[in-house]
Curated annotation (Swiss-Prot):
The species this protein was found in: Oryza sativa subsp. japonica (Rice)
Domain PPM-type phosphatase: 113-470
Gene Ontology terms describing biological process: regulation of intracellular signal transduction
Annotated binding of Mn(2+) 1, by residue: D152, G153
Lineage: Eukaryota, Viridiplantae, Streptophyta, Embryophyta, Tracheophyta
Protein name per the record: Probable protein phosphatase 2C 37
Length: 474
């Protein structure tokens, strides 16, 4: 007769084993289920108490496999644990082993490499700024968050330079504050009510790995907060401003925020997918070297002909001054849109949204457009650039050039292309390229070739390009 107790089979005195063998069996089984230190103390207690009452084993104790040197008696008496609430050996071992951290998992599944180039081009002053901040902040589960941005200043470089130094700091502070609030949020049943109140008070974008059932999230709100003071004051400080296109990468989410006419384009399965809309008027045509390129607002379709997003060749078409709702907003606050070489706020600024431009308040606002994209295995690269490149290069061309550079490039050819790009810039009378942090030569090569192509197509503005490789080809 076999009696089960706490998941351990205990043979009775009328079994095949004599009492001495049964006692030895019990002792060996207890050694198998009790940690080494506890087993040693138990043996001492048993010897002093003359084999007194045995201690009960906790249900969560691990049960490693018998060692090869186990005696025949122990092998005869060994058996699996019952289904009376005790876990199996594999389950107990799994609880003891630490799970892989979110950061290591994200880094292995969602690689990120980047490179950037900035050229003054045919402008006398350099007003663009690029910010590359990998792992500037951490996700709630420990995953790294990456910050990439392009700022295109106007009226001077002061606002764009200030954004380069402070924007990622402000975003990190917001992330930390929202993460702390998120840990204390109300139950999930109250989530929708909170979101409705939040939407009524400002733009809300949510980052949720794994959807609603995911293991955490961070909510980023566009808030009215005190601005970072600029060292310039008076009229000089009132007439300067900057655009901003910012990309945050965390795990399988790609968050893009845009204010102005800089742009972010994702290359997915060979097709360009614009992730931002330009906040300036759409010129009727574009020309370089005598070639006119027709532009049109609308949507671009996938290979099935279905409309899936903004126009692939859309160089503008976001919150420009002559868009009906933007024009109504500007006129509601006492401003007006004047058509002077395109629609302009008060006939001065061709954008209806930008950072700075104090003299054009409240017509020109700094509220960004935010898009959230779930990354897929088809995502190849992300391109951030100022209008110095987008004014002469279409989304499709930029996507093709960057993709081919990343697929075919090598560190040696990347450096050679970089040197040739700098030589071409110097020979054209433009300053040499200002190279950003180079974490992947192929990314730098792609950015350098795009900047060189824009320069060859007679771009008249500063040119800044950031190429982010989402495939991890290194």
């Amino acid at each position: 007769m076999v009696m089960a107790s706490a998941g351990v089979n205990m043979p009775g005195g009328d079994g095949d084993h004599p009492p001495a063998a049964a006692q030895e069996c019990h002792r060996l089984r207890r050694r198998r289920y009790v940690p080494a230190a506890a087993a040693a103390s138990e043996d001492g207690d048993n010897s002093s108490n003359g084999g007194g009452e045995k201690r009960s084993l906790p249900a969560s104790s691990a049960s490693p496999s018998p060692s090869p040197t186990s005696s025949a008696a122990s092998s005869d008496c060994s058996s699996d644990r019952d289904d009376d609430g005790c876990s199996s050996t594999a389950g107990a071992a799994a609880r003891r082993l630490p799970l892989p951290s979110g950061a290591s998992t994200a880094a292995a599944v969602w690689p990120v490499a980047f490179g950037s180039v900035s050229l003054a081009g045919r402008m006398r002053d350099m007003e663009d700024a690029v910010s590359l901040r990998p792992s500037f902040c951490t996700w709630l589960d420990g995953s790294p968050m990456h910050f990439f941005a392009v700022f295109d200043g106007h009226g001077g470089p002061h606002v764009s330079a200030l954004c380069r130094e402070q924007m990622h700091v402000i975003v990190a502070e917001e992330m930390v504050a929202e993460a702390a609030a998120l840990r204390q949020r109300q139950p999930a049943a109250m989530e929708e009510e909170e979101e409705e109140r939040a939407v009524a008070g400002g733009a809300v974008a949510e980052l949720r790995p794994g959807g609603r059932a995911g293991g955490g999230g961070v909510r980023v709100r566009a808030r009215h907060r005190a601005g970072v003071p600029c060292p310039l004051s008076g009229q000089t400080g009132a007439i300067i401003g900057s655009t901003a296109v910012v990309a945050l990468l965390v795990r399988d989410r790609l968050v893009v925020s845009n204010c102005g006419d800089s742009r972010a384009v994702l290359c997915r399965a060979g097709d360009p997918l614009p992730l931002s809309s330009d906040h300036k008027g759409l010129n009727p045509s574009l020309s370089w070297r005598g070639t006119r390129v027709a532009l049109a607002r609308g949507t671009w379709g996938d290979k099935t002909g279905q409309s899936v997003g903004p126009a692939a060749l859309l160089l503008s078409g976001g919150a420009h001054p002559d868009r009906p709702d933007e024009k109504a907003r500007i006129e509601a606050v006492g401003g007006r849109v004047v058509y002077l070489n395109g629609p302009r706020v008060r006939g001065i600024l061709a954008m209806s949204r930008a950072l700075g431009d104090k003299y054009l308040k409240p017509e020109v606002i700094c509220e960004p457009d935010i898009t959230i994209t779930v990354r897929t295995v088809d995502d190849e690269c992300l391109i951030l650039a100022s209008d110095g490149m987008w004014d002469v290069i279409s989304n499709e061309t930029a996507s093709d050039v960057a993709r081919q550079c990343l697929e075919d490039g090598s560190p040696t050819s990347g450096r050679r292309a970089a040197r040739s790009g700098e030589a071409a810039s110097s020979s054209a009378g433009a300053p040499a390229a200002a190279v950003g942090q180079e974490s992947e030569p192929r990314c730098y090569r792609a950015a350098a070739l795009l900047a060189r192509l824009a320069l060859g197509r007679e771009s008249s503005d500063n040119i800044s390009v950031v190429v982010i490789d989402l495939k991890g080809r290194g």
